[in-house]
Amino acid sequence: MQNSEGGADSPASVALRPSAAAPPVPASPQRVLVQAASSAPKGAQMQPISLPRVQQVPQQVQPVQHVYPAQVQYAEGGDAVYTNGAIRTAYTYNPEPQMYAPSSAASYFEAPGGAQVTVAASSPPAVPSHSMVGITMDVGGSPIVSSTGAYLIHGGMDSTRHSLAHTSRSSPATLEMAIENLQKSEGITSHKSGLLNSHLQWLLDNYETAEGVSLPRSSLYNHYLRHCQEHKLDPVNAASFGKLIRSVFMGLRTRRLGTRGNSKYHYYGIRLKPDSPLNRLQEDTQYMAMRQQPMHQKPRYRPAQKTDSLGDSSSHSGLHSTPEQTTAAQNQHHQQYIDVSHVFPEFPAPDLGSVLLQDGVTLHDVKALQLVYRRHCEATVDVVMNLQFHYIEKLWLSFWNSKASSSDGPTSLPASDEDPEGAVLPKDKLISLCQCDPILRWMRSCDHILYQALVEILIPDVLRPVPSTLTQAIRNFAKSLEGWLTNAMSDFPQQVIQTKVGVVSAFAQTLRRYTSLNHLAQAARAVLQNTSQINQMLSDLNRVDFANVQEQASWVCQCEESVVQRLEQDFKLTLQQQSSLDQWASWLDSVVTQVLKQHAGSPSFPKAARQFLLKWSFYSSMVIRDLTLRSAASFGSFHLIRLLYDEYMFYLVEHRVAEATGETPIAVMGERLSQNVTSALWPGSEPGSSPGELCSSAWLATLC
């Protein structure tokens, strides 16, 4: 950069040149926004410009060694313009127009994760834009909007800016190549390439990629055909449409999902956008109620009846968004956190042995019960998999209530086992069958399999972060289960009701425990990631008198001192290494394996597992007691960690016992409740306590 050393009256010429690196010049109240062209015409003469206050320039411009190569520069001074040989046109700064003025109420959503980002009112205002400026810059030199669909977040912990842009879409060049390939392979003429562009835009407007969710291939193609019909477009065939989708959403996979005899091909990793108008169609609401099955197939259970025609539904869809539509969109977003690919296992056959059936009940009726109960359980899985919990009550009422099945007429079986829809079982036969002990035991075993599958669908990983809205919905669902089933089976014998409610109580209690465990995991994750808290915890733990703890606990637990010392050292070492929550979970799993290894394959394995839980809880309570007496600064953190580790130990042990006994965890937790769920069998229990609330304590107390 060159300056004139003359006085204020002498003219001077100044030229700006890009160089290596330097911070940008702070903008003054008077600025000129300059856009540089790629190159200057040959022979162009640079005109000198007089500067009225040239003696002040060295102090302002001397530190600058670089002008950012983004071809946008800020110049200081009054009416002066610093010219550059590479700059063709200068534009004056206009303070009137405003670009994207942020406010405290503005919110943006990132499509893949759904995290909400609120732009604070204290964010720096955006630089007004000019219609001929290629890219708008803020004071720091970063682009405010660099591409369609990207948002800039001002400010943060590290004063950095993050661009929220969906990265899984194909680039324009890739889309052009995809169109060319389709034209060559499918023989599509060039005049139809414009139609392909409109199809691509429709896909980008209505669908997005997301992990852990799926969409039936046929449903997506039906949406496409409806779009072409509404806009009078010529659709491509299904194979070409599949190639088109894979060219837009890179890495898309295909899976065959569903129960046996009713599985469908799904695109795995794609979903409808929550704000897509396709969500508002009544047909799509019914798709989600039936795992988003295609229109041409008859669903096993259709919870919502169609009230309006397709034309009426589509014509009014853009006017109002009903609560049902909002809930459907939210459920579809939550589906990425559950296991929608879970395959429902087979049921065992009832073992009748030499038991004589009651009068009027035949093996023909038993076969019909197997078919209708399997169909009923599959419908339950479909509804839960789509998070439509309120339909469970209607399902149970339709199966058990007297209004749903007539006592008149004979039992009928379908023409083939692949089509269980034709099976019919009158209500009086259903009651008679449930009063048969082998049938009741078989139904309880089926319920254990069903509810364990539902737990694995709703909570596939107890430590994985999930939205609080989904957790609360699951807890509300668990709270209603016992009342729904009792009401639906009001006409059945008390023994049948107690058996059924005993299993569903264990299911509800499992959902409550797992959601509580998940909540503790998210709270503890923040503690384990805080270095200062970890250091304080380690300092407080080193002050605990573990020798005194061992002396007091040895009389009760009778544990080997070497085992206790090894656990103490491993715990301190893991804490000192600032391990993550997943690493702590692996350590706890290894502790359970080491302690129960000597009891593997032994009939005493369940008792040894329960004893280990009691001893673990007693030792941890003694350590917390010592920390409390010493007024440890990290007592709150230790209390949270202790709650999490106790719950996770319970989770690990119940799964080890289930594996050792060949049962499901639901069956292990509900073994006492399955015998009887009445309060008469629970002396000392508080009035009004549900069987599910007694499940955990009863299982631990069973030491024989």
Curated annotation (Swiss-Prot):
Taxonomic superkingdom: Eukaryota
GO cellular component: cytoplasm; nucleus
Compositional bias annotation for Low complexity: 10-20, 307-334
Region annotated Disordered, chain positions: 1-39, 292-334
Subcellular location: Nucleus; Cytoplasm
Self-association state and partner proteins as the record states: Homodimer; probably only forms homodimers in testis. Heterodimer; heterodimerizes with RFX1 and RFX3.
Name used for this protein in its record: DNA-binding protein RFX2
Organism encoding this protein: Pongo abelii (Sumatran orangutan)
